[in-house]
From Swiss-Prot:
Pfam families: RNA_pol_Rpb2_1 (PF04563), RNA_pol_Rpb2_2 (PF04561), RNA_pol_Rpb2_3 (PF04565), RNA_pol_Rpb2_45 (PF10385), RNA_pol_Rpb2_6 (PF00562), RNA_pol_Rpb2_7 (PF04560). It catalyses: RNA(n) + a ribonucleoside 5'-triphosphate = RNA(n+1) + diphosphate. Gene3D superfamilies: 2.40.50.100, 2.40.50.150, 3.90.1100.10, DNA-directed RNA polymerase, beta subunit, external 1 domain (2.30.150.10), DNA-directed RNA polymerase, subunit 2, domain 6 (2.40.270.10), RNA polymerase alpha subunit dimerisation domain (3.90.1800.10), RNA polymerase Rpb2, domain 2 (3.90.1110.10). Its EC number is 2.7.7.6. The RNAP catalytic core consists of 2 alpha, 1 beta, 1 beta' and 1 omega subunit. When a sigma factor is associated with the core the holoenzyme is formed, which can initiate transcription. The gene is rpoB. Belongs to the RNA polymerase beta chain family. The lineage of its organism: Bacteria, Bacillati, Actinomycetota, Actinomycetes, Mycobacteriales. GO terms for cellular component: DNA-directed RNA polymerase complex. DNA-dependent RNA polymerase catalyzes the transcription of DNA into RNA using the four ribonucleoside triphosphates as substrates. This is DNA-directed RNA polymerase subunit beta.
């Protein structure tokens, strides 16, 4: 059943309801939503529950009337069973998949690098068909990764997300093209299965109907019909109405079924001797055997729907039938003839039209469950081969299911999927919103999907059928634009994998509260009105003509009697991140795209602050993201501390909720939870107990509300640069905590075992001051780059010992052995405080990789204050880099002395057309100061306030406001409220009704000559921090071949002096500078050392030598068999020295320089 039907929720408050204890937000929403936002993680959790056949999924399916469907694992075992041997005398079948308890908790899995998984067992039955003997056993099928409550998987200790894939649905697709030469209309059709060979029919420019089987050469379509057993008379009887098919039949020379079969066999298997039997088997296997060909339920459903077959009957056949092929050919010839309708075999009239491949009726989602199911299918088919072989080799009497089955291929297939598939991704954990959006992502890439290079503009473009299903705004910038999208807020996925969106039913011009979920195909058959169409209290449309949309995105005005459905909510078409942009309706789409994407890059701040101006989506997003702690049962809070909250439930049970304290996220941001309830407080089920990162009182809080002035300032905020007040640095307003993980292991080497120890050779006591007796740094130590975190020594290669050394070794034992210092040190450019240490040892029975005896992890936290070069952004795509941080006293200030926090340039607004930021600034000021609308003596309101609800007529200062997308505050309401703001304590109103204020220059005290827009804007600190980007090098690793420094911060590389920079030097004739840059500062190996020596000894810099890259060029030319000679200015040949220069080695050794630097060298090695 495709149309789900739910009864509407009782009349909702205009703010998002459904979560007890939610913070108060004054909302401008005027449209009542009859439906709550569905669970935002259902896309992931429902699909996985279907795969494992969970009880909750079965109950939901039964409620929907889908009782015929079995779970994903059951399906696949039924598909595989029975496995028979080659003679058919033995068979093995599988059934009843079930799981044991998971082996470890999610926290333990993350800590110990384990996979969060449960053991999977199935019942295997071996039947000996000769004797009738049945042996049944429960067989272990490996550990199966389980989904956490948050919709993620933990694989080897890291959290991963499986992204849903958008693919072309199996089915039958008709296409139209025009022949370039004759300008004739050509039509074709593809029958695309879930798996198996493609079948294509087409009408060519000579008006013959042809068929291509499995992408091979074209043949007349009548050959296929004859091969299926049709006679010429039967073909003429069925297709007599079509001239082109009769013409094709005349041109077809094959005499009967046998000849047609052989003809097809020759085309499919050229070079093999054709026989009737092999040809018959080949054709049957290609399309009519379910082992080789599978339309899947969805493909059968699509074919039946398109061709009008078996309507109203349950979906059974997963292979093609003869009737499918005949109906497809008839549809094609009628389409070519220009017919608009055809009568299907069942007597049903179906429209004849070409298909739009980018329509969401023809694209479906492969969700997590299906992706994992496909992977298990691969593993099981590999296992099937093994079982068959073992059936033939093992003794029949001794065979048990256990001896036949090898689970390795299945386990390997699952591991391969989670570890390496393009759709199993390292979870984006910058903040709760980024994680939530990642789980709701839809990707057209991946195995069986499109590739970046081949995807054209049509696939990437916004399509009318995306409305309410995929967000038209949120997609990446760059090569993946349009290929990766995000599920809309209200959308859900039906059992066939098509995305549905809810609509309110309209009956006889009256809007009811009945909600139906429609797929894109079904929506095309109806007339749909917008959510903001005016409706009276009884649900009747108040206007005579209402704007509606029809199939293909056409909009027009119609009378209310013609309307079938109405949108559920104004925010129905956008995704969660987009729905969190206030005044989205005033932003240009390109900037809204950046705004939605940049919210995902927000860094959690030390103190989160919910936005003054929100959209009402903040609460649901934060709760569903799963980073806040929610009460399971109603009760009373018994105990609260920084680490846990205990709740005594009304049924007498106690539950203790543990907080995550300063944990490291995947992206190195800090995930910290803190309680927001008090002892003795009563809490409802579903109420937020503790805030996580980027949340305040259970609401998403990605940034800070800052007092902003929009004005140019001395040119310092030119080109989107931003000017900040020093107050934000001093008071840690935009300070964030970042946690880095450093890891070192002690292994067994050929020369002996490495050892983690405090006893490091040639190191002063100062360096070891913070190490404990094991050689591991203490928690709380302040560290900077180069400091030792964990001491480790590695045995050096030993030469033959002298008698004296042997004596010393005998007396003092191992200590006299030569060891190298290979300690873990803080990388270049990093500082911080040690906040955690984890030690894993083989002696403590910890599970470690082979050859590793001990593993130490050190967590270093950095407190990063805001600084010049960091990137800030608003929610409207208005991003910029901090150009200057001014002392608080130099910032412009309001007439009451309040200094501005942040100055943005006016030039960043007009051409970008993101006016939402200006409206947000004004509304932010209104919310901060509070307001009181003046009511006349007779109780009448001003005109602009007519539509405002009663509770909106006055509000105190610091009131949080919700202005939902497409249903928010109007301009006249903003103007009116700006004129009704509350005065400050001196009785003065700082900002006039036009939103502008007189500002004074902090340096001179003089007023600026023009009024300036002032208000509160929500500013986000982005993940692009200058500390992660700035980089400098003196000496470091060199490339092994060219001997030039490596590039990039990660490799501790140098700055490339490139072609254009050389031109600049040449243009100025700076010959010696240029020579120095190209030799001794780059890859003149000998010169580098000699210069270093000269500097140390205070001598003059010697002449540069030959660069290494020049020698490489000579070698490359010689490898092409060219005899290359280097001549001096007087024509004499110069010998290129290739050998080792002993003087050079000696000089380098004296100076303590290691010349064997290459790519493999790490920064730590170089510091030694």
């Amino acid at each position: 059943m495709l149309e789900g039907r739910i009864l509407a929720v009782s009349s909702q408050t205009k703010a998002v309801s459904g979560i007890p204890g939610a913070p108060k937000r004054v909302s401008f929403a005027k449209i009542r939503e009859p439906l709550e936002v569905p669970g935002l993680l259902d896309l992931q959790t429902d699909s996985f529950e279907w795969l494992i056949g969970a009880q909750s999924w079965r109950e939901r399916a039964a409620a929907r009337g889908d009782s015929a469907i079995s779970g994903g694992l059951e399906d696949i075992l039924a598909e595989l069973s029975p496995i028979e041997d080659f003679s058919g005398s033995m068979s093995l079948s599988f059934s009843d998949p079930r799981f044991d308890e998971v082996k470890a908790s999610t926290d333990e899995c993350k800590d110990k690098d384990m996979t969060y998984a449960a053991p999977l067992f199935v019942t295997a039955e071996f039947i000996n068909n000769n004797t009738g003997e049945i042996k049944s056993q429960t067989v272990f099928m490996g550990d199966f990764p389980m989904m956490t409550d948050k919709g993620t998987f933990i694989i080897n200790g890291t959290e991963r997300v499986v992204v849903s894939q958008l693919v072309r649905s199996p089915g039958v697709y008709f296409d139209h093209s025009v022949d370039k030469g004759t300008e004739k209309d050509l039509h074709s059709v593809k029958v695309i299965p879930g798996r198996g060979a493609w079948l294509e029919f087409d009408v060519d420019k000579r008006d013959t109907v042809g068929v291509r089987i499995d992408r091979k050469r074209r043949q007349p379509v009548t050959v296929l019909l004859k091969a299926l057993g049709w006679t010429t008379e039967q073909i003429a009887e069925r297709f007599g109405f079509s001239e082109i098919l009769m013409a094709t039949l005349e041109k077809d020379n094959t005499a009967g079924t046998d000849e047609a079969l052989l003809d097809i066999y020759r085309k499919l298997r050229p070079g093999e001797p054709p026989t009737k039997e092999s040809a018959q088997t080949l054709l049957e296997n290609l399309f009519f055997k379910d082992k080789r060909y599978d339309l899947a339920r969805v493909g059968r459903y699509k074919i039946n729907k398109k061709l009008g077959l078996n309507t109203g009957q349950p979906i059974v056949a997963s292979t093609l039938t003869e009737e499918d092929i005949v109906a497809t050919i008839e549809y094609l010839v009628r389409l070519h003839a220009g017919d608009t309708e055809m009568t299907a075999p069942g007597g049903v009239a179906v429209p004849v039209e070409v298909d739009d491949i980018d329509h969401f009726g023809n694209r479906r989602l492969r969700t997590v469950g299906e992706l994992i199911q496909n992977q298990i299918r691969v593993g099981l088919s590999r296992m099937e081969r093994v079982v068959r072989e073992r059936m033939t080799t093992q003794d029949v009497e001794a065979i048990t299911p256990q001896t036949l089955i090898n689970i390795r291929p299945v386990v390997a297939a699952i591991k391969e999927f989670f570890g390496t598939s393009q759709l199993s991704q390292f979870m984006d954990q910058n903040n709760p919103l980024s994680g939530l959006t990642h789980k709701r992502r839809l990707s057209a890439l991946g195995p069986g999907g499109l590739s970046r290079e081949r995807a054209g503009l049509e696939v990437r473009d916004v399509h009318p059928s995306h409305y309410g299903r995929m967000c038209p705004i949120e997609t990446p910038e760059g090569p993946n634009i349009g290929l990766i999208g995000s599920l809309s807020v209200y959308a859900r996925v039906n059992p066939f994998g098509f995305i549905e969106t809810p609509y309110r039913k309209v009956e006889g011009g009256q809007v009811t509260d009945q909600v139906d979920y429609l797929t894109a195909d079904e929506e095309d058959r109806h007339v749909v009105a917008q959510a903001n169409s005016a409706v009276d209290a009884n649900g009747h449309f108040t206007d005579d003509r209402i704007l509606v949309r029809r199939k293909g995105g056409e909009v027009e005005f119609v009378s209310s009697a013609e309307i079938d459905y109405m949108d559920v909510s104004p925010r129905q078409m956008v995704s969660v991140a987009t729905a969190m942009i206030p005044f989205l309706e005033h932003d240009d789409a390109n900037r809204a795209l950046m705004g939605a994407n940049m919210q995902r890059q927000a860094v959690p701040l030390v103190r989160s602050e919910a936005p003054l101006v929100g959209t009402g989506m903040e609460l649901r997003a934060a709760v569903d993201a799963g980073d806040v702690i929610v009460t399971e049962k109603t009760g009373v809070v018994e105990e609260v501390s920084a680490d846990y909250v205990t709740v005594m439930a009304d049924d007498g049970s106690r539950k203790t909720y543990r907080m995550r304290k300063f944990a490291r996220s995947n992206q190195g941001t800090c995930a910290n939870q803190r309680p927001i309830v008090d002892e003795g407080q009563r809490v409802e089920s579903g109420q937020v107990l503790a805030d996580g990162p980027c949340t305040e009182n259970g609401e998403m809080a990605l940034g800070k509300n800052l007092l902003v002035a929009i004005m140019p300032w001395e040119g310092h905020n030119y080109e989107d640069a931003i000017i900040l007040s020093q107050r934000l640095v001093e008071e840690d307003v935009l300070t964030s905590i970042h946690i880095e993980e450093h890891e070192i292991d002690a292994r067994d080497t050929k020369l002996g075992a490495e050892e983690i120890t405090r006893d490091i050779p040639n190191v002063s006591d100062e360096v070891l001051a913070d190490l404990d007796e094991r050689g591991i740094i203490r928690i709380g130590a302040e560290v900077r780059d180069g400091d030792v975190l964990v001491g480790k020594v590695t045995p050096k290669g030993e030469t033959e010992l002298t008698p004296e050394e042997r004596l010393l070794r005998a007396i003092f034992g191992e200590k006299a052995r030569e060891v190298r210092d290979t300690s873990l040190k803080v990388p270049h450019g990093e500082t911080g405080k040690v906040i955690g240490i984890r030690v894993f040892s083989r002696d403590d029975d910890d599970d470690l990789p082979p050859g590793v005896n001990e593993l130490v992890r050190v967590y270093v936290a950095q407190k990063r204050k805001i600084q010049d070069g960091d990137k800030l952004a608003g929610r409207h795509g208005n991003k910029g880099v901090i150009g200057k941080i001014l002392p608080q006293e130099d910032m412009p200030f309001l007439p009451d002395g309040t200094p501005i926090d942040i100055i943005l340039n006016t030039h960043g607004v007009p051409r970008r057309m993101n006016i939402g930021q200006i409206l947000e600034t004004h509304l932010g000021w209104i919310g901060k100061t509070g307001w009181n609308v003046q009511i006349a003596g007779d109780g009448s309101r001003p005109d602009w306030a007519e539509q405002l609800p009663e509770e909106m007529l006055s509000a105190p200062s610091d009131s949080n406001i919700a202005t939902p997308v497409f249903d928010g505050a109007k301009e006249d309401e903003l103007t009116g409220l700006l004129g009704s703001t509350l005065p400050n304590r001196d009785g003065e109103v700082m900002v006039a009704s036009d939103g502008k204020a007189t500002l004074f220059d902090g340096r001179s005290g003089e007023p600026f000559p023009y009024p300036v827009s002032v208000g509160y804007m929500y500013i986000i600190k982005l993940h692009h921090l200058v500390d992660d980007k700035i980089h400098a090098r003196s000496t470091g690793p060199y490339s092994m071949i060219t001997q030039q420094p490596l590039g990039g911060k990660a490799q501790f590389g140098g700055q490339r002096f490139g072609e254009m920079e050389c031109w600049a030097m040449q243009a100025y004739g700076a010959a010696y500078t240029l020579q120095e840059l190209l030799t001794i500062k780059s890859d003149d190996v000998v010169g580098r050392v000699k210069v270093y020596e000269a500097i140390v000894k205070g001598e003059n810099i010697p002449e540069p030598g030959i660069p290494e890259s020049f020698k490489v060029l000579l070698k490359e030319l010689q490898s092409l068999c060219l005899n290359v000679e280097v001549l001096s200015s007087d024509g004499a040949a110069i010998a290129m020295a290739d050998g080792d220069d002993e003087d050079l080695e000696r000089a380098a050794a004296n100076l303590g320089i290691n010349l064997s630097r290459n790519e493999a060298a790490t920064v730590d090695d170089l510091a030694n």
